From Swiss-Prot:
Family per record: Belongs to the venom Kunitz-type family. Sea anemone type 2 potassium channel toxin subfamily.
Keyword Signal part of the UniProt annotation: no
Entry's localization field: Secreted; Nematocyst
Matches recorded under PANTHER family: KUNITZ-TYPE PROTEASE INHIBITOR-RELATED, TISSUE FACTOR PATHWAY INHIBITOR
Identification of the protein by name: PI-actitoxin-Aeq3b
Organism: Actinia equina (Beadlet anemone)
Superkingdom as given in the UniProt entry: Eukaryota
Alphabetic keyword roster: Disulfide bond, Ion channel impairing toxin, Nematocyst, Potassium channel impairing toxin, Protease inhibitor, Secreted, Serine protease inhibitor, Toxin
Domain named BPTI/Kunitz inhibitor: residues: 6-56
Amino acid sequence: DASSFCQLPAVVGKCRGYFPRFYYNTEAGKCQQFIYGGCGGNRNNFETVEDCRATCHSH
């Protein structure tokens, strides 16, 4: 299921970069911003809130 990753938690990753990204927060029922370190993590990681909503908004 292509949208199952929308249920994954936000993961900063092991690198120390500072990249504002968006993830779908299942508890809040909406996309929220978090800081991504630049490597690792999971697919619940979008460059724009629009991409996040387009992929995960139906959950």
